[in-house]
């Protein structure tokens, strides 16, 4: 990753990374340190990951244990540090869990994004970057739908903000991140059976360095309101990934290690998309980074209030039905 274009935007700046103890957030923190950020504030509710990054990176990193769902606490933190740049990576991301607890996807992912974005604007941050996912495109999962709501909220903020530039980045599946398929396959190989949902299921893949490159470099070309996507090439069959991981471990697929097909889970797609049909990807000065204009829906604020009402009543079925309608209209 060539960081020379990014350094002037980061050097001597106060940067905040929500979810900074996670696999993506921690790599953002490491890169910010190399780019000579003045201070890096990790906001994370999970202390172990944040502690590890703090020990590795050193005094430049400050850790605040807090939930992005706690407005008063986040307000205190924002007021204390006055970040120039906010990278919002904190989120619930596991599709099956969010199908079981859709109200938590709304409270954490959507309301959490709203709170952090509002506070970034309140304290005059220069940039706010949302970490989103390709599962937000034509979502069939609650998790994907919640991230689509986040994209729309950030776009709505960009239309009204006088100072802060609001943008988003869409990730594919990030290799070797927490909960991703390759570490799972490696563990399953030890037991002699690897599970794949469907023989034809495909996903777009990117590495952790590519994910961080997208986050940092897109910020240098953001005007506000855009969504940036890394050109990951074609989608890859998960079955091919499983077979390769088995072979790389010195074993023979279907002989030394069985592969079982478990069926798509609720919320799983057979194939993901990087863009909605109405979005028109445009090239940027960075060869591998594409840009689309953000978008929203009519009466978004009113719809969001109705969604929150259902979420805070813990109406799981109501949340699921409403958020799917809201993000596929």
Locations of regions flagged by a protein language model:
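Conserved beta-strand scaffold in the Rossmann-like NAD(H)/NADP(H)-binding core
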Residues: 63, 130, 168-170
């Amino acid at each position: 990753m060539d960081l020379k274009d990014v350094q002037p935007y980061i050097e001597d700046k106060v940067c905040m990374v929500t979810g900074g103890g996670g696999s993506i957030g921690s790599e953002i923190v490491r890169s910010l340190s190399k780019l000579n950020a003045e201070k890096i504030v990790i906001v994370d509710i999970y202390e172990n990951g944040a502690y590890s990054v703090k020990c590795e990176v050193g005094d430049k990193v400050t850790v605040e244990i807090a939930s992005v769902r706690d407005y008063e606490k986040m307000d205190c933190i924002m007021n204390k540090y006055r970040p120039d740049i906010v990278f919002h990576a904190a989120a619930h991301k596991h599709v099956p869990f969010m199908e079981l607890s859709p109200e938590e996807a709304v409270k954490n992912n959507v309301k959490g994004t709203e709170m952090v974005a509002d506070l970034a604007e309140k304290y005059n941050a220069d940039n706010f970057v949302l970490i989103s996912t390709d599962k937000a495109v034509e979502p069939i999962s609650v998790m994907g739908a919640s991230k689509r709501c986040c994209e729309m909220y950030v776009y709505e903020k960009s239309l009204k903000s006088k100072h802060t530039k609001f943008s988003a980045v869409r990730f594919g599946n990030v290799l070797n991140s927490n909960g991703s398929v390759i570490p799972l396959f490696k563990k399953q190989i030890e037991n002699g059976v690897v599970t794949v949902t469907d023989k034809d299921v495909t996903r777009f893949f990117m590495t952790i360095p590519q994910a961080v490159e997208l986050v940092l470099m897109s910020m240098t070309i953001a005007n506000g309101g855009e969504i940036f996507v890394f050109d990951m090439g074609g989608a890859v069959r998960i079955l091919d990934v499983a077979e390769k991981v088995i072979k790389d471990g010195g074993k023979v697929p279907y002989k030394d290690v069985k592969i079982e097909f478990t069926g798509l889970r609720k919320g799983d797609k057979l194939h993901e998309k990087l863009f909605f049909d109405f979005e028109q990807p445009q090239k940027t000065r960075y060869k591998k980074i594409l840009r689309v204009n953000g978008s929203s829906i009519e009466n978004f604020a009113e719809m969001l209030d109705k969604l929150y009402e259902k979420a805070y009543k813990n109406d799981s079925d109501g949340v699921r039905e409403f958020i799917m309608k809201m993000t596929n209209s």
